UniProtKB/Swiss-Prot annotation:
Protein's pathway: Cofactor biosynthesis; biotin biosynthesis; biotin from 7,8-diaminononanoate: step 2/2
Record-level GO BP terms: biotin biosynthetic process
Name of the protein this chain belongs to: Biotin synthase
Catalytic activity: (4R,5S)-dethiobiotin + (sulfur carrier)-SH + 2 reduced [2Fe-2S]-[ferredoxin] + 2 S-adenosyl-L-methionine = (sulfur carrier)-H + biotin + 2 5'-deoxyadenosine + 2 L-methionine + 2 oxidized [2Fe-2S]-[ferredoxin]
InterPro entries: Aldolase_TIM, BATS_dom, Biotin_synth/BioAB, Biotin_synthase, Elp3/MiaA/NifB-like_rSAM, rSAM
Cofactor(s) named in the record: [4Fe-4S] cluster; [2Fe-2S] cluster
Domain of life from the UniProt record: Bacteria
Annotated cofactor note: Binds 1 [4Fe-4S] cluster. The cluster is coordinated with 3 cysteines and an exchangeable S-adenosyl-L-methionine.
Organism for this UniProt entry: Geobacter metallireducens (strain ATCC 53774 / DSM 7210 / GS-15)
CDD domains: Radical_SAM
Keyword annotations: 2Fe-2S, 4Fe-4S, Biotin biosynthesis, Iron, Iron-sulfur, Metal-binding, S-adenosyl-L-methionine, Transferase
Function in brief: Catalyzes the conversion of dethiobiotin (DTB) to biotin by the insertion of a sulfur atom into dethiobiotin via a radical-based mechanism.
Radical SAM core domain sequence ranges: 48-278
Entry's family note: Belongs to the radical SAM superfamily. Biotin synthase family.
Length: 329
C-alpha cells in the first residue's frame, strides 16, 4: 500500500477523523494511488465492520405523481417518463413482497413511497399494519422511506415495529438548489434528526453523477458524519429519459469506486451500501465495491428500474468468499 495511505488508514483506525482538505485531495487519486485508496478503505472497513456483506431489498409501494422536482427522479410530476403511477399498494402486497425479499436473501426490507410525505390516517395506518404482520411472519427487518415526517409519525412507525428510517439528502447542501427547488435542504436534515430522536436507526445517503463537484461529494459525507447516521446508501445516476438529467453521462467505474472509498474513510464505522445505478455505472467492476469499502448492496429491483437477478449477486458473493450478514443487525 502507498505509505501515506497506509499511515492514513492507521490514523483512522486509531480514531482520527479525515479532514475536508485531506478528503478533497484524496478524491483526485489516480493510477496506482487510486488502488492504494481502495486498499486503505478496505482495511478500515474490515477493521470496523468485519468481512461480512449486508443485503437489502425495497418495494416501490406508491409510485409517481410526486410534487417535488428532483432533477434525477422519474417519479416527479414535473417530468414526463414511463415510470408507473399507482396509489399505495394494499397490505397483503406489502407483506408478500417482504416474504419474497426474505426468500431472496435480504435481511432488510424497505417500504418506499413517492411524494413529499405520507398521509396520516389510512396510508400510514396501512403501512403500520403491514409492518406488524411482517414482524410476526418473517425475520426480515422492516424499514420505511416515506418522505419528510414529523416526530409523531416517527414514533408511530417505531411503535409499529419499524427499525430503520431511510431518508436521503441526495447531494450536498451547496448543490441541492440545482437539483430540487420545491423544498428546502433543511427539511430533509430535520427529518433525519426527528427520526433519530424517535429512536429509529437512520439510513441516509445520496446520489452521484448529478453534476456535483468532488468537493461537494465530500461536503455531503461531512454532513452525514455530523448527523451521525447509521447506514449510508450510495447511488449513482442512471439517467432516465424525460427527466432533467436525461442527457447526463454515467460516472466511470473507477470514479464510483473512489467515491465509495472516500465515504468509507470519512465514515469509517458506518454501514455503506451501493444501491441504484450499480449495474450501469460499475459494469464489470461491480464486485470491486467490497474492496473499496462498501459493506453492503441492494439486491432485486430499484424504484422504477430493474436490477439484475438476485442469484447473480449471490454468485458474486460466493466467488468473493464473502459472508452475508444483516443490514439492520
Amino acid at each position: 500500500m502507498n505509505k501515506s495511505l497506509e499511515t492514513l488508514a492507521g490514523r483512522i483506525i486509531a480514531g482520527e477523523q479525515l479532514s475536508v482538505e485531506e478528503s478533497i485531495a484524496l478524491s483526485a487519486s489516480s493510477g496506482t494511488d487510486a488502488f492504494a485508496l481502495f486498499l486503505a478503505a478496505s482495511r478500515v472497513k474490515e477493521h470496523f465492520l468485519g468481512n461480512g456483506v449486508d443485503l437489502c431489498s425495497i418495494i416501490n409501494a406508491k409510485s409517481g405523481r410526486c410534487p417535488e422536482n428532483c432533477a434525477f427522479c422519474a417519479q416527479s410530476a414535473h417530468h414526463t417518463t414511463n415510470a408507473p403511477i399507482y396509489p399505495l399498494v394494499d397490505e397483503d402486497k406489502l407483506v408478500a413482497c417482504a416474504k419474497e425479499a426474505e426468500a431472496a436473501g435480504s435481511r432488510c426490507y424497505g417500504i418506499i413511497t413517492s411524494g413529499t410525505t405520507i398521509k396520516k390516517g389510512e396510508e400510514l395506518d396501512r403501512i403500520c399494519r403491514a409492518v406488524r404482520r411482517i414482524r410476526e411472519t418473517t425475520s426480515i427487518a422492516p424499514s420505511c422511506s416515506l418522505g419528510i415526517i414529523d416526530h409523531e409519525t416517527a414514533v408511530t412507525l417505531r411503535e409499529a415495529g419499524v427499525e430503520t428510517y431511510h431518508h436521503n439528502l441526495e447531494t450536498s447542501r451547496s448543490f441541492f438548489p440545482h437539483i430540487c427547488t420545491t423544498h428546502d435542504y433543511e427539511e430533509d436534515v430535520e427529518t433525519v434528526r426527528v427520526a433519530k430522536q424517535a429512536g429509529l436507526t437512520i439510513c441516509c445517503g445520496g446520489i452521484f453523477g448529478l453534476g456535483e463537484t468532488a468537493a461537494q461529494r465530500v461536503e455531503l459525507a461531512m454532513t452525514l458524519r455530523e448527523l451521525d447516521v447509521d447506514s449510508v446508501p450510495l447511488n449513482f445516476l442512471n439517467p432516465i429519459e424525460g427527466t432533467r438529467l436525461a442527457g447526463s453521462k454515467l460516472i466511470s467505474p473507477l470514479e464510483c469506486l473512489k467515491t465509495i472509498a472516500l465515504f468509507r474513510l470519512i465514515l469509517p464505522t458506518k454501514k455503506i451500501a451501493v444501491c441504484g445505478g450499480r449495474e450501469q455505472n460499475l459494469r464489470d467492476l461491480q464486485s470491486w465495491i467490497f474492496f473499496a469499502g462498501a459493506s453492503g448492496t441492494m439486491i432485486g429491483n430499484y424504484l422504477t428500474t430493474t436490477g439484475r437477478p438476485a442469484e447473480q449477486d449471490w454468485q458474486m458473493l460466493r466467488d468473493l468468499e464473502l459472508a452475508v450478514g444483516g443490514c439492520c443487525e
